[in-house]
């Protein structure tokens, strides 16, 4: 959910 390349 964050602006990074992760599914967080």
From Swiss-Prot:
Compartment annotation: Secreted
Keywords: Amidation, Neuropeptide, Secreted
One BP annotation, GO: neuropeptide signaling pathway
GO cellular component: extracellular region
Family classification: Belongs to the allatostatin family.
UniProt function note: May act as a neurotransmitter or neuromodulator.
UniProt name for this protein: Carcinustatin-9
Species: Carcinus maenas
Species classification: Eukaryota, Metazoa, Ecdysozoa, Arthropoda, Crustacea
């Amino acid at each position: 959910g964050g602006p990074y390349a992760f599914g967080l």
